[in-house]
Amino acid sequence: MAKEIKFSEDARTKMLKGVDKLADTVKSTIGPKGRNVVLEQSYGSPTITNDGVTIAKAIELEDHFENMGAKLVSEVASKTNDIAGDGTTTATVLTQAIVNEGMKNVTAGANPVGIRRGIEKATSKAVEALHKMSHEVKTKDDIAQIASISSANPEVGKLIANAMEKVGNDGVITIEESRGVDTTLDVVEGMQFDRGYMSQYMVTDNDKMEANLDNPYILITDKKIGNIQDILPVLQSVVEQSRSLLIIADDITGEALPTLVLNKMRGTFNVVAVKAPGFGDRRKEQLEDIAILTGGTVITDDLGLNLKDVTIEQLGQSNKVTVTKDDTTIVEGAGSQEQIAERVGIIKQQISETTSDFDKEKLQERLAKLSGGVAVIRVGAATETELKEKKYRIEDALNATRAAVEEGFVPGGGTALANVISDLEDVEAEGDEATGVNIVRRALEEPVRQIAENAGEEGSVIVTKLKGQKPGVGYNAANDEWVDMVEAGIVDPTKVTRSALQNAASVSALLLTTEAVVADLPEDNPAPAAPAPGMGGMM
């Protein structure tokens, strides 16, 4: 396919138009009085959202060169979302500000490579200053405030704070759609995996159709049990102690399962059998997790262990086990806290090293199950459109909260970025590098300016007033007042603010140093085929 090439100012001007079109759409959503954007869907009702990355990804421009500029800004939003889970609109606003100021200087004759070095120096200094002013997340209220600001909803803030309190900072919090109009929180404490009882005759509560085992022993194996004689010695040991038993095995076949069910129905002892969770290597890892959590040993050929030789000491234990037709939940396992902590450390290390999103998700699930449990936020709304919008907000709030737990938080509302401007005076730079530093100084004002303008105020006036305030005091656009942002609970995660600035600076510097742009030439529509002779009049 033939290509069209644009050079120098022509190339940069076209890309700048694309940057502005996307950024102008996204930045209207920033702040407590930001607006929504309606996105057409190929099917179904349109989506109404104020989520920066969702809007950015939805935009495709007709002009190829403009579209490339827009896609680079979309990349900033996506990268920020991937790293921090929020801050995509801030990243977009910063990118537009840096690119626009940079383009003016490059057009006036400045060297773009020198400007890029200045931008990089200033960004590095600003990030350092952000870390210095960062506050550690210490209380449930801190979490609630961060989630409330991100979602623009105090109720969501409380919900996420409650969820994190229940399952811990490493716990899994999932967001699902509810069938009702209320948004609720369900917490599954302990370790849960998606395998239910092998026979409904094992239930102990016929109303709920679930099996409850109090203070049970747990036999954990990756073997198939086909002969009851294989596990008879350990069954007798359990019966002698008048305890119940949970069997987790690859499968129970032949006469073994009916024999277990028969003994359960006769009241000989209380037993429930479930299949081992996962597949392949993941199954082995999950069984090992269960063993460590319950203080047991996985009976496997890898360790040279046979079912006939299992002793009571090799069984796991827990305070309670609940088994439904779909799930098994182990509460308060009897495993050593030291061994659990060591296992958690190994999984965290694997999470930091893996490059696969799927593997990372599975590792985080395992980590949560060992660390405390799983919380499910069920999002309810009156309409499907409202449900989607609400779900986006809660996802952003959850991501922001996790980011704050990781790196702390800074004053919100763009105040932190404006406060670090004074730190850039220490950056050593001359000529075009100094120009690059000044471009970043000017861009750091932009989030405050845009938040004010979305609230109906004059952005330049608010920025000038902010410079006269002591550090940490900022403009609360929601109530049109000047407050100490941290005391007022208006805070942003440090990781979100830092990532937004770093990603904006990175892509902006690339745009400014662009000298040529190559795009596909639009195809001419071919002429319609002529009708075959003698076919006229046919319908």
UniProtKB/Swiss-Prot annotation:
Q: What class of enzyme is it?
A: isomerase
Q: Where does ATP bind?
A: T29, I30, G31, P32, D86, G87, T88, T89, T90, G413, N476, A477, A478, D492
Q: Which keywords fit this entry according to its UniProt record?
A: ATP-binding, Chaperone, Cytoplasm, Isomerase, Nucleotide-binding
A Pfam cross-reference name? Cpn60_TCP1
PROSITE patterns linked: CHAPERONINS_CPN60
GO terms classed as biological process: protein refolding
Q: Which Gene3D superfamilies match?
A: GroEL (3.50.7.10), GroEL-like equatorial domain (1.10.560.10), TCP-1-like chaperonin intermediate domain (3.30.260.10)
Judging by the UniProt lineage, the source's domain of life is Bacteria
What is known about what this protein does? Answer: Together with its co-chaperonin GroES, plays an essential role in assisting protein folding. The GroEL-GroES system forms a nano-cage that allows encapsulation of the non-native substrate proteins and provides a physical environment optimized to promote and accelerate protein folding.
* HAMAP family on file: CH60
By sequence similarity, the record places it as follows: Belongs to the chaperonin (HSP60) family.
Q: What is this protein called?
A: Chaperonin GroEL
